[in-house]
């Protein structure tokens, strides 16, 4: 049986570093308040002339190089984003054109902060059923363009960035072991963008995330026939350190076994998990054969988790 996994991964980080001290000068907040409630110390914003598709392209080039796969070998491009350059054409088609991935089909996925996991689960189906050999999955957001920088409740939370993964067949003892996707439309309006900017009911989102992230992580392990004792590293959506810590505690993992890139990137929505993976790989925290649990939640309300044995 064909097993789908990640062959290579890459990221793009916004060029402008915006610290908590910078926000102290703009709105009624403080570095201590932000750190205590979110764990965020700084975030990155992309320049005005860099759009979502530009960031996606840069991350994709790095992922293709890491995978040793050419753009011409990509069969499908999946872009998870809620901040496209424009309503249409899709970001995926813009990336396809820039990469020169002429034989690739292309579509965007709107699953907010869980989008990258939705993309991996979708790519897995195409690869394991024999439909496609290589799938490029991208999580990318330019949240700075839909964030009200005068709203102290949301301005300090978000950042810009992109992460891309090239998927393909891997060894039977590597790759995606199980996934879980879910949604609860009853909470749809807790995070929305009805107007120009993001609106969020932070209290309700926090309660949902603390409960659902831990439950989903445990559920995907059960689906994979594994237990929390088998987990080598947890990569949660980098939204808020308190939510992330709740997930880690549900899995009874030590602090050093969870990614915490939220402190330097903020919440980059669908890009947060692949961006974290790139950093942890560079730092040697993810090794060949490690069992990773990826888990995220987002507007919808939606959630997703994935058990992945790292390596090819």
UniProtKB/Swiss-Prot annotation:
InterPro entries: ACP_syn_III_C, ACP_syn_III_N, FabH, Thiolase-like
GO CC terms: cytoplasm
Catalytic residues of the enzyme: 113, 237, 267
Bilayer-crossing regions: none
Localization (cell): Cytoplasm
Keywords: Acyltransferase, Cytoplasm, Fatty acid biosynthesis, Fatty acid metabolism, Lipid biosynthesis, Lipid metabolism, Multifunctional enzyme, Transferase
Chemical reaction(s) catalysed: malonyl-[ACP] + acetyl-CoA + H(+) = 3-oxobutanoyl-[ACP] + CO2 + CoA
Region (ACP-binding): 238-242
Pfam families per the UniProt record, alphabetical: ACP_syn_III, ACP_syn_III_C
Biochemical pathway: Lipid metabolism; fatty acid biosynthesis
Keyword Cytoplasm appears in the UniProt entry: yes
GO terms, biological process: fatty acid biosynthetic process
The protein's Enzyme Commission number: 2.3.1.180
Keyword 4Fe-4S found: no
Molecular-function GO term, any one: beta-ketoacyl-acyl-carrier-protein synthase III activity
Entry similarity comment: Belongs to the thiolase-like superfamily. FabH family.
Primary role: Catalyzes the condensation reaction of fatty acid synthesis by the addition to an acyl acceptor of two carbons from malonyl-ACP. Catalyzes the first condensation reaction which initiates fatty acid synthesis and may therefore play a role in governing the total rate of fatty acid production. Possesses both acetoacetyl-ACP synthase and acetyl transacylase activities. Its substrate specificity determines the biosynthesis of branched-chain and/or straight-chain of fatty acids.
PANTHER family: 3-OXOACYL-[ACYL-CARRIER-PROTEIN] SYNTHASE, BETA-KETOACYL-[ACYL-CARRIER-PROTEIN] SYNTHASE III, CHLOROPLASTIC
Domain commentary: The last Arg residue of the ACP-binding site is essential for the weak association between ACP/AcpP and FabH.
Subunit structure: Homodimer.
Protein name: Beta-ketoacyl-[acyl-carrier-protein] synthase III 1
